[in-house]
């Protein structure tokens, strides 16, 4: 990735506006980094904090959230998705702020029947408004092993990556009147839940509870390239080498890989859905 240090004055103004200090961020284990928030025992941490699992049965799903809030960062998580007949299930992994005008950056993994591919559903919300969906298939089986899903969020762009391969970029086009998430710290959330009214083939394929409990697994959480704060902190802290990721965009090789993914594996792009937007596509689609 290329680094644009010439934008440091803008970075400084952003940091001072929120209240940043520059200190080292660290990748913690799941005990240190997350709280299990719901599921009544259906989410659990194992291996001295190195493995977390969420399960779903007919009574309830489960979920967890980060102890810290983030304002920009490169956040990695390895996931192994629900195997077998996962139709009607959703594994969500996203960042979100609070309030009615929230910001949000989404990965959602929509289950499918045995032998049929998962759908990766991505979205970006700004000020409580989303409608920026892009959906993809994967070029591997996401249930056979762990794979890395990354949100790289900085003042320039939001990059969605799978195993280091970019699949989508949402650029900061505020100068052209497009809102961009840059002022509201967000927590990381993840959950496994039932959504068979829409998740698989628009809700035509329902969940088969005879396959329960369904399980998604997590490893290797890494937030070492980030700016964050705890609930008890007023200030957001950045790791000292923040300039290595704070202004990065795709280099030509990475852009080429993203074009490969979007050509061969994208199945929905809101920027080409003219029926959905009869009054005209969203502004960022034309830039």
Swiss-Prot record:
<dbReference type="Pfam" id="PF06955">
    <property type="entry name" value="XET_C"/>
</dbReference>
<dbReference type="InterPro" id="IPR016455">
    <property type="entry name" value="XTH"/>
</dbReference>
<comment type="similarity">
    <text>Belongs to the glycosyl hydrolase 16 family. XTH group 2 subfamily.</text>
</comment>
<feature type="site" description="Important for catalytic activity">
    <location>
        <position position="106"/>
    </location>
</feature>
<keyword id="KW-0378">Hydrolase</keyword>
<feature type="binding site">
    <location>
        <position position="108"/>
    </location>
    <ligand>
        <name>xyloglucan</name>
    </ligand>
</feature>
<keyword id="KW-0808">Transferase</keyword>
<feature type="domain" description="GH16">
    <location>
        <begin position="28"/>
        <end position="218"/>
    </location>
</feature>
<keyword id="KW-0326">Glycosidase</keyword>
<feature type="binding site">
    <location>
        <position position="202"/>
    </location>
    <ligand>
        <name>xyloglucan</name>
    </ligand>
</feature>
<feature type="binding site">
    <location>
        <begin position="197"/>
        <end position="198"/>
    </location>
    <ligand>
        <name>xyloglucan</name>
    </ligand>
</feature>
<dbReference type="GO" id="GO:0030247">
    <property type="term" value="F:polysaccharide binding"/>
</dbReference>
<dbReference type="InterPro" id="IPR008263">
    <property type="entry name" value="GH16_AS"/>
</dbReference>
<keyword id="KW-0961">Cell wall biogenesis/degradation</keyword>
<dbReference type="Pfam" id="PF00722">
    <property type="entry name" value="Glyco_hydro_16"/>
</dbReference>
<dbReference type="InterPro" id="IPR044791">
    <property type="entry name" value="Beta-glucanase/XTH"/>
</dbReference>
<dbReference type="GO" id="GO:0016762">
    <property type="term" value="F:xyloglucan:xyloglucosyl transferase activity"/>
</dbReference>
<feature type="active site" description="Proton donor">
    <location>
        <position position="108"/>
    </location>
</feature>
<dbReference type="InterPro" id="IPR010713">
    <property type="entry name" value="XET_C"/>
</dbReference>
<dbReference type="GO" id="GO:0004553">
    <property type="term" value="F:hydrolase activity, hydrolyzing O-glycosyl compounds"/>
</dbReference>
<comment type="function">
    <text>Catalyzes xyloglucan endohydrolysis (XEH) and/or endotransglycosylation (XET). Cleaves and religates xyloglucan polymers, an essential constituent of the primary cell wall, and thereby participates in cell wall construction of growing tissues. Has some preference for non-fucosylated xyloglucan polymer. No apparent XEH activity in vitro.</text>
</comment>
<keyword id="KW-0052">Apoplast</keyword>
<dbReference type="InterPro" id="IPR013320">
    <property type="entry name" value="ConA-like_dom_sf"/>
</dbReference>
<dbReference type="InterPro" id="IPR000757">
    <property type="entry name" value="GH16"/>
</dbReference>
<dbReference type="GO" id="GO:0042546">
    <property type="term" value="P:cell wall biogenesis"/>
</dbReference>
<feature type="signal peptide">
    <location>
        <begin position="1"/>
        <end position="27"/>
    </location>
</feature>
<feature type="disulfide bond">
    <location>
        <begin position="271"/>
        <end position="285"/>
    </location>
</feature>
<feature type="glycosylation site" description="N-linked (GlcNAc...) asparagine">
    <location>
        <position position="112"/>
    </location>
</feature>
<dbReference type="GO" id="GO:0071555">
    <property type="term" value="P:cell wall organization"/>
</dbReference>
<protein>
    <recommendedName>
        <fullName>Xyloglucan endotransglucosylase/hydrolase protein 14</fullName>
        <ecNumber>2.4.1.207</ecNumber>
    </recommendedName>
</protein>
<keyword id="KW-0325">Glycoprotein</keyword>
<dbReference type="GO" id="GO:0010411">
    <property type="term" value="P:xyloglucan metabolic process"/>
</dbReference>
<keyword id="KW-1015">Disulfide bond</keyword>
<feature type="binding site">
    <location>
        <begin position="121"/>
        <end position="123"/>
    </location>
    <ligand>
        <name>xyloglucan</name>
    </ligand>
</feature>
<keyword id="KW-0964">Secreted</keyword>
<keyword id="KW-0134">Cell wall</keyword>
<feature type="active site" description="Nucleophile">
    <location>
        <position position="104"/>
    </location>
</feature>
<feature type="binding site">
    <location>
        <begin position="131"/>
        <end position="133"/>
    </location>
    <ligand>
        <name>xyloglucan</name>
    </ligand>
</feature>
<dbReference type="GO" id="GO:0048046">
    <property type="term" value="C:apoplast"/>
</dbReference>
<feature type="disulfide bond">
    <location>
        <begin position="227"/>
        <end position="238"/>
    </location>
</feature>
<keyword id="KW-0732">Signal</keyword>
<feature type="binding site">
    <location>
        <position position="276"/>
    </location>
    <ligand>
        <name>xyloglucan</name>
    </ligand>
</feature>
């Amino acid at each position: 990735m290329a680094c644009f240090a010439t934008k440091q004055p803008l970075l400084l103004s952003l940091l001072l506006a929120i209240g940043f200090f520059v200190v080292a961020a660290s990748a913690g284990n799941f005990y240190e980094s997350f709280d299990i928030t719901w599921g009544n025992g259906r989410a659990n941490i194992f291996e001295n904090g190195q493995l977390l699992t969420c399960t779903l049965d007919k009574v309830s799903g489960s979920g967890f959230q980060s102890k810290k809030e983030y304002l920009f960062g490169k956040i990695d998580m390895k996931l192994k998705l629900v195997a077998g007949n996962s139709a009607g299930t959703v594994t969500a992994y996203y960042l979100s702020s609070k309030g009615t005008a929230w910001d949000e950056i989404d990965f959602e993994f929509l289950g499918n029947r045995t032998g049929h591919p998962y759908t990766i559903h991505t979205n970006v919300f700004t000020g409580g408004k989303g409608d920026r969906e892009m959906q993809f298939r994967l070029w591997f089986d996401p249930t056979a092993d762990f794979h890395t899903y990354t949100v790289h969020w900085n003042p320039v762009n939001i990059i969605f990556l799978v195993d280091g391969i970019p699949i989508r970029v949402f650029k900061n086009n505020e100068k052209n009147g497009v809102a961009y998430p840059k002022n509201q710290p967000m927590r990381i959330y993840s959950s496994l839940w039932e959504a068979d009214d829409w998740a698989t083939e628009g809700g035509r394929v329902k969940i088969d509870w005879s396959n329960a409990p369904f399980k998604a697994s997590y490893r290797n959480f890494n937030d070492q390239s980030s700016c964050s704060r705890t609930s008890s902190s007023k200030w957001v802290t950045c790791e000292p080498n923040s300039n290595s990721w704070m202004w990065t965009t795709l280099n030509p090789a990475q852009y080429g890989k993203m074009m490969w993914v979007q050509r061969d594996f994208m199945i929905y792009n809101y920027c080409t859905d003219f029926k959905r937007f009869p009054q005209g596509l969203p502004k960022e689609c034309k830039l």
